[in-house]
Amino acid sequence: MLVITPTAENVTESPNARMTGLAAPSRGSTELSTWTVAMEAGRSGPEHSVSREQVWTVTSGVLEVTCGGRTEKIAAGQTLVLPPDVLRRVHAPQKAEAHVAMRADGVVRVPGTEETRELPWAR
């Protein structure tokens, strides 16, 4: 058994959100990564795809998620399953937080580029 306590070194700030890494291979998990996402009202992440399925559970506020051309509002207490390799964008119409889980080997791709990018908070 392993207990993980978030620290400042596990936090990644972007212009759109704050990601706090929890379970990940760098912190003792072998298969899964989990993290929290905190977004201020009006912020949106970039359109991108992820190579692995992700499970988002909104813990406060509301998120609007567009995936594969369909938009859903996800409120606190609801869970959204995002399929792999489908374009998505996450928007916070109000301040929101979510807990995310994914296989640890997932990578991100942005439309119009061939390169993939690792998620540092999930490694």
Predicted regions: what they are:
Residues M1-E31, P111-R123:
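A short, N-terminal "cap"/entry segment at the start of jelly-roll beta-barrel domains
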Residues S49-A76:
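A short beta-strand-loop-beta hairpin characteristic of the jelly-roll/cupin
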Residues S33-V50:
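Conserved short histidine dyad/triad with adjacent acidic residue
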Residues G28, K73-A76, P84-R109:
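Ligand-binding loop in jelly-roll beta-barrel domains
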